[in-house]
Amino acid sequence: MLEIVQLFIQRKEFFMNLLYQHLQISFISIVLAILIGGLIGIFMSEYKKISKPFMSIINFVYTIPSISMLGFLIPLSGVGNTTAIIALVIYALLPMVKNTYTGMEQVDKKMIEAATGLGSTRFQVLWKIKFPLALPVIMAGIRSMAIMTIALAGIASFIGAGGLGVAIYRGITTNNTAMTLVGSLLIALLALIVDGLFAIIEKRIQHHSKKSIKKQLF
């Protein structure tokens, strides 16, 4: 344990730089996955005929090992951060799409009927009723997806990308256990912090979504 602390203090700038790179790669991947996965999930809930084929494709892609996925992408986008981000977004789509679709489908049909009866358009029902009610479930998906993305970003170093995976990979190749452990612990710590932040946001969204629906209907 003392060796790990000493290494971190001695190479603090090195590890902080890798931490920044890891945050950058993870943040971009998470934002893209939220936008793309959220839109796909909403689209699937509105057009249910395509939901099964879409979900089957996403489930199939999710079964491909991460190293294999990186291997498939290298001829298309080369090595580096771009390929790592593309791979992370692909893997992040399943929890994002699934939770968005599930959240939209779980909305009480009576609420939708009431809003439609009051003259709301399809878009208004989607934006003002279904989406706010589905938001807590969507947030749960974002939370789990963010943790998974941060953890999975550790493999980015295998294709020449940055991040804390560089420390892990270097530690493995040089038989430096302390280096590997520092990189792993920093990823775990980062994941825990992000999980805590999303837990706070999730609680606040649950509270505000209920209030906003009441205002819309009454």
Predicted regions and their residues:
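Transmembrane alpha-helix signature in integral membrane proteins
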Residues: 15-43
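Short cytoplasmic-facing helical segments at TM-TM junctions of multi-pass membrane proteins
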Residues: 100-138
